């Protein structure tokens, strides 16, 4: 389902420029963020896909409204023995042969039912909530850890950088999907104890933490490289001369200069995290049934693809659209903040 994530990122930082007469010139009166926003507004494709993503988020947020006031069911309720009126006829939600009803395009079972008699539309919307929530939360965890580790490794260098870099090398030696499955299955079986906090194996926090951890090297290393180049800049030397300590220099002087890079990586990380969550759930190492996720809904539909193809096709299409929208919008943000920047993904 999912390909390996980025194994090589290149980020080149360029000053904000405007084009005049075929030459790149500084945009007078505009800061880099305002200039970036202006560039982004001109990128109609990126804006369109950004709107698509917002619509997907809105549909996920509205899942309880659809379930409670339209479909009148829950993502866990089965209707194996129920019937429904369709085209003037009374039909079983699930036939005696175990074949679920297809899309009715009406309030109940709008996209049909699954083999357990559950409403596919309701589960799709709740699955979107879980998949997007895990993707965003995991990207946030990755971003926070990457910022701290990248700053510490790049600023202190020496043995500190060596220890952190070797840990990244170990994680980088495993394909992300393999590392994610190994961690996911292990934590599902035994849960996770964080001091007084006990996280159950079937909690949504488990795949969130797993995905958040496995992507750290792919963001932290580029940040480390930029910190290494910035620590010798004049503004850092000036801060040292004024008596600023390492923490102040890292978080007050260097970190603001990494903001555009962090924003670009974070946007693309959400797409990778959503895709990896679906892959882990499909393989049984992510969100555990009966809790819905696009990945486990697709898994349930694979065995019924000949009799009920909608169960696998619809969530697959939603997953594809979400990842495409995030990637296109992320590319637009990258181009807007720095037209010469490269965030390259090599497999």
What positions do the PLM features span?
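Gly/Trp-centered helix-boundary motif
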Residues: 1-147, 151-152, 159, 177, ...
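Amphipathic alpha-helical segments that mediate coupling or scaffolding at interfaces
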Residues: 39, 124-127, 131, 152, ...
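Hydrophobic alpha-helical transmembrane segments of integral membrane proteins
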Residues: 60, 171-172, 213-214, 252-253, ...
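Generic hydrophobic transmembrane alpha-helix motif, especially the helices
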Residues: 110, 114, 136, 141-155, ...
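Short helix-to-coil transition segments within interhelical loops
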Residues: 113-118, 155-156, 238-255, 298
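Short hydrophobic alpha-helical segments within the ABC transporter permease transmembrane module
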Residues: 120-127, 167, 223, 227, ...
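Transmembrane alpha-helices
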Residues: 129-145, 228, 247-279, 321, ...
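Glycine-rich helix-loop "coupling/hinge" segments at transmembrane-helix boundaries
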Residues: 183-187, 198-199, 211, 268-269, ...
């Amino acid at each position: 389902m999912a390909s390996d994530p980025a194994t090589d990122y290149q980020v080149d930082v360029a000053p904000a420029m405007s084009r005049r007469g075929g030459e790149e010139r500084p945009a007078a009166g505009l800061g880099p963020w305002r200039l970036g926003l202006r560039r982004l507004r001109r990128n109609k494709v990126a804006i369109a896909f950004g709107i698509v993503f917002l619509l997907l988020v809105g549909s996920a947020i509205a899942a309880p409204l659809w379930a409670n006031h339209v479909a009148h069911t829950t993502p866990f309720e089965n209707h194996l023995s129920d019937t429904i009126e369709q085209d003037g006829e009374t039909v079983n939600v699930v036939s005696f042969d175990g074949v679920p009803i297809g899309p009715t395009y009406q309030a109940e079972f709008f996209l049909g039912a699954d083999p357990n008699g559950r409403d596919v539309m309701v589960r799709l919307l709740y699955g979107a909530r879980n998949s997007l929530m895990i993707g965003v939360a995991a990207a946030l965890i990755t971003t926070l850890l990457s910022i701290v580790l990248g700053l510490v490794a790049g600023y202190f260098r020496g043995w500190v950088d060596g220890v952190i870099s070797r840990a990244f090398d170990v994680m980088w030696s495993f394909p992300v999907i393999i590392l994610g499955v190994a961690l996911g299955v292990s934590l599902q079986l035994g849960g996770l104890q964080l001091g007084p906090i006990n996280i159950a194996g079937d909690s949504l926090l488990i795949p969130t933490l797993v995905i958040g951890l496995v992507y750290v090297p792919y963001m932290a290393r580029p940040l480390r490289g930029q910190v290494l180049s910035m620590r010798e800049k004049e503004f850092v030397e000036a801060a040292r001369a004024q008596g600023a300590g390492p923490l102040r220099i890292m978080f007050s002087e260097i970190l603001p200069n990494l903001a555009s890079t962090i924003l670009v990586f974070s946007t693309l990380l959400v797409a990778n995290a959503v895709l990896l969550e679906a892959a882990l759930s499909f393989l049984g190492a992510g969100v555990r049934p009966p809790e819905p996720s696009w990945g486990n809904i697709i898994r349930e539909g694979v065995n019924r693809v000949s009799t009920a193809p909608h169960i696998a096709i619809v969530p697959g299409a939603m997953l594809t659209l979400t990842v495409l929208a995030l990637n296109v919008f992320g590319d637009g943000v990258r181009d807007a903040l720095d037209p010469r920047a490269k965030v390259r993904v090599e497999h």
